[in-house]
Amino acid sequence: MSDIALTVSVLALVAVVGLWIGNIKVRGVGFGIGGVLFGGIIVGHFVDQAGVTLSGDMLHFIQEFGLILFVYTIGIQVGPGFFASLRVSGLRLNLFAVLIVIMGGLVTAILHKIFAIPLPVVLGIFSGAVTNTPALGAGQQILRDLGTPVDLVDQMGMSYAMAYPFGICGILLTMWLMRLIFRVNVEAEAQKHESSLANGHSLIQTMNIRVENPNLNNMAIQDVPILNSDKIICSRLKRDDTLMVPSPGTIIQAGDLLHLVGQPTDLHNAQLVIGKEVDTSLSTRGTDLRVERVVVTNEKVLGKRIRDLHFKERYDVVISRLNRAGVELVASSDASLQFGDILNLVGRPASIDAVANVVGNAQQKLQQVQMLPVFIGIGLGVLLGSIPLFVPGFPVALKLGLAGGPLIMALILGRIGSIGKLYWFMPPSANLALRELGIVLFLAVVGLKSGGDFVDTLTQGEGLSWIGYGIFITAIPLITVGLLARIFAKMNYLTLCGMLAGSMTDPPALAFANNLHATSGAAALSYATVYPLVMFLRIITPQLLAVIFWGMG
């Protein structure tokens, strides 16, 4: 058997063993995809004992390409919501998550200085303690750039594996500890979260208002400032028994019922100006109007603003709301359409069908993957990661590398959505498949390279010490920030758990947090809010630590 065939066969065996290990769960918690690392260590140990030689060049390529696939698909997935998460609504969560990252780096620096831990080892412990695989890849790359021997670079994977198990357990123990210390009632916390959402600014809601302000009688909708803004959409108007789709030029009269869509605060402001909120139904049932959701799949409308498509003027159809990447938005006239946007339309059946034809509404296209944008994005990401950033006093130039470059490029492209006929939307199933494939390949190679010396290091070397260092790096930031967030910021417990899981970019911890309450989405929401920024920082941090430690000698 050739070296290439043997290498592929061994990698397949690693994946099988590792995924089987990952599926083993204790009280609903397992290693998940991280099991592949331990599968690689097990197989690598026996491969080393048998004296089998694998293709080093091929293993290196597979490791790097797997990492690129993983971080690129993450960026494409979270890109549409990344920049929004940095705004005020998620600022507090992101600040606490960033504090966890910074504290982890500081604890790592202190341990390195006090105990003189070798640089590759301490970076591996850091990456494993925070359960972040791309950090491992970024750290290994910067070490190679610094001229570190290959055998020492491989030590990073070994120390990563030592610290990884408690990295997962440490998050779960912190969640349990917070619940114990503050005597948390999970059901009550879930109800508080739902109440805060209902009273907050994040949900798009509707309100039916009767026109009672005499100053608005016989005025056109476009002449009423509150109705001629991008914050409120008037999607239906009922006069006597007639329901209609209003246009900007529609004249409103006293007694008209308006169906408005917007955020709660804006709806309240509109109600103060227009009149009184009523419980009267403005349903399209039994009328010649209907409400339908259509999806944007036509390349010709991608990037065009809603106002430029003139749906109201041409088809007498109103877009009442827009759903992008699972987030409900007011359909602002300045909003540009992206592939996969879901539009809520109100109008007559024939008119809605006409608009659906314009925007595409081809459901099968949502399951298709444009491969050209994928490789354009990966290529641009690799180029971005290769650009050197020279910092005075540093021995080597900083680079985003193969972990950071594709991630940043994917975030940007995911936010842009489309350029001409190229769109960076990827079906969730395809994104997940590529992401899982990438991380399996990466972890399999890391495990194989670490497996030969793993047992000896654990039983006869410094393996137990490495585990101890990892416990400090995991526990100190999580417990400290958890206490601060709960005591001073009065953070909801479920939101706190999601933030802690997101700060470690740890899906098993998110699964545990989600299981705390069957119906609440609080943990998943906070996890998604902090995940993009934290992932970026986790990739950059080991590079900064490596350069700083290297410069300190």
Swiss-Prot record:
Gene Ontology biological process terms in this record: potassium ion transport
Domain of life of the source:
Bacteria
Q: Which GO terms describe its molecular function?
A: monoatomic cation transmembrane transporter activity
**InterPro entries the UniProt entry points to:** AAE_transporter, RCK_C, RCK_C_sf, Transpt_YidE_put, YidE_YbjL
Q: Which UniProt keywords apply?
A: Cell membrane, Membrane, Repeat, Transmembrane, Transmembrane helix, Transport
Q: How does it sit in the membrane?
A: Multi-pass membrane protein
Where do the RCK C-terminal domain residues begin and end?
192-276, 279-361
The record lists the membrane-crossing segments as: 4-24, 28-48, 65-85, 95-115, 158-178, 371-391, 393-413, 437-457, 464-484, 493-513, 533-553
| Pfam family name, one | TrkA_C
Keyword Magnesium carried by entry: no
The cellular location(s) given in this protein's UniProt record come to:
Cell membrane
The protein here is known as: Putative transport protein YidE
